Amino acid sequence: MPLLDSFTVDHTRMNAPAVRVAKTMQTPKGDTITVFDLRFTAPNKDILSEKGIHTLEHLYAGFMRNHLNGDSVEIIDISPMGCRTGFYMSLIGTPSEQQVADAWLASMEDVLKVESQNKIPELNEYQCGTAAMHSLEEAQQIAKNILAAGVSVNKNDELALPESMLKELRVD
């Protein structure tokens, strides 16, 4: 099985909250797709609550689009990581890590402005696969934590696992 890019970086050295360019690729028509690792918590040290990350999934995707989409950037998708330490964001364009960090912080401010659970978009059984698993309070606590900590940048070259270690860790 091929080694995915996200598994070539040392998760024990990742800062959080932090933005990282996880991957860039060119489409056949020449557009650049950039995938960002939006790391909310330090891997293997903390985890986002189920209800909190699920509610953020509903709120964050819209808020990030409001703050980052423009003439040269269009967000394709923002999805929570299975490890529940953050989100992956795929987009067309090449915004800087600082632009992404600024949009992230502005989005967290927006999360704090949501007044009640019934203001969460698509929170119903028709548009959400687990409509009962939400907590605006938990999502707002996550947002407060991000705003208090600020958002830094993780660089791939600083986190790259040595080839020898990748070979040693490989499961055949």
Swiss-Prot record:
Enzyme Commission code(s) on record = 4.4.1.21
Instruction: Quote the cofactor binding remark.
Output: Binds 1 Fe cation per subunit.
Q: Which Gene3D superfamilies match?
A: S-ribosylhomocysteinase (LuxS) (3.30.1360.80)
Q: Its catalytic activity?
A: S-(5-deoxy-D-ribos-5-yl)-L-homocysteine = (S)-4,5-dihydroxypentane-2,3-dione + L-homocysteine
Alphabetically list the UniProt keywords.
Answer: Autoinducer synthesis, Iron, Lyase, Metal-binding, Quorum sensing
Example GO BP: quorum sensing
Q: Which SUPFAM superfamilies match?
A: LuxS/MPP-like metallohydrolase (SSF63411)
Name a Pfam family for this protein.
LuxS
Q: Which residues bind Fe cation?
A: H54, H58, C128
From the UniProt record, list the coiled-coil ranges. none
User: Its function?
Assistant: Involved in the synthesis of autoinducer 2 (AI-2) which is secreted by bacteria and is used to communicate both the cell density and the metabolic potential of the environment. The regulation of gene expression in response to changes in cell density is called quorum sensing. Catalyzes the transformation of S-ribosylhomocysteine (RHC) to homocysteine (HC) and 4,5-dihydroxy-2,3-pentadione (DPD).
Which family would the database say this protein is a member of? Belongs to the LuxS family.
Stored PANTHER family: S-RIBOSYLHOMOCYSTEINE LYASE (PTHR35799:SF1)
- The protein's name in its UniProt record: S-ribosylhomocysteine lyase
Native organism is Vibrio parahaemolyticus serotype O3:K6 (strain RIMD 2210633)
